[in-house]
Amino acid sequence: VLDTETGNMMEYRHLIGNPRYKKDWGISFGNEIGRLAQGMPGRVKGTDTIHFIHKHQLPADRWKDVTYGRICCNYREQKEEKNRTRLTVGGDRINYTGDCGTPTADLLTVKLLLNSVISTPYVKFMDIDIKNFYLNTPMPRFEYFRLKLDNFPEDVILQYGLREKVSSDGYVYLEVRKGMYGLPQAGILAQELLEERLAKHGYTQSKHTPGLWKHKWRPICFSLVVDDFGVKYVGKEHADHLVAALKEDYEVETDWEGTKYCGITIDWDYKKREVHISMPGYVNKACIRFEHEKPTRKQDQPHQHTIPTYGAKIQFAKEADTSRPLDKEEKRYIQKVVGTFLYYGRAVDPTMLPALSAIASSQATPTEETMIKTKQFLDYAACHPDAIITYKASDMVLATHSDASYLSEPKARSRAGGAFLPIQRCT
């Protein structure tokens, strides 16, 4: 969570240690425990996903499988409960031998679906969100994790009698009986159950495009990203059919305007047959997080350009980078910048991708030169904070276009770019 006063990013331990945030985020975590466990009276209903147990109740053959829990906080403006806390399980210590791969729609599939909506007459778009998607999936094999008693708000401690269950080393042990965030098997188990339930109503997932679902005869299809449905439909009665099918087994939220999906803001203009996608405010928040101010001189170039040697018949590669290696904190800073902006670049601002690719290629062993590239990139981002991509109706016939630059990367490498664009009217 971003502290707008200091620009620092705060985790749960920081939030409950700050008098300004302690009450609100304590309530948020209490609600999360209630959802996962057996509820919090008057606030949330439980899903029986987790059960608090005594340490001696752990099966003797599962001691080595006990993992940790992590409390993740996020502020979600578009959600009904804006202070969002999620308790996740340390999946890196789970010994699950089955297949954990979960088909999910990638950004290319999502963008093609949006393009298809405005390219097809009489089509509309909506999105559906399943609440507690993972938490409704029974698991044949239970998992176990532990948390410090100090992490729990007082009302949760009293509600579940945790002082009677805490171990001598201050930990509370939990048994996971249904799918939960962080478990490597949670995604595939939840999707297999969804597939079984929707098949009864005529919906199946594409064999060739992960995360794309269709009905066997209704004019409706949707992309699925974890628990978010982006639905393309002709005729509201067909969308109502999907919503009703989901409501048989899940609690769902619907947005009939289809204005938000995968963190992307969507502005539909069905009359002009255009759609505009953006992520307003994302870059500004990132710049505050990285304590990077907008430069006084506008930066219109996301990465350095390679100056050619004019008149030379042969262009030689740049000399090797011999600048100072970065320390651990500086290296982590580089990695955070790349991780933060990569999704934004892929989603709405592809002009950032060559620069991010160049920085990412050296983030394992970054140098002072890498930091200079990163600062220039942040200057560019700060000067161009709210990119918008507009898709116009097309015949949805795809052509391949590619291009490459010569000796523009270290070690005599070239930078290549590729794109798939509709042949008729492009973006």
Listing of model-derived features with the role each one plays in the protein:
Residues 1-427:
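Long, low-complexity, charge-biased intrinsically disordered regions
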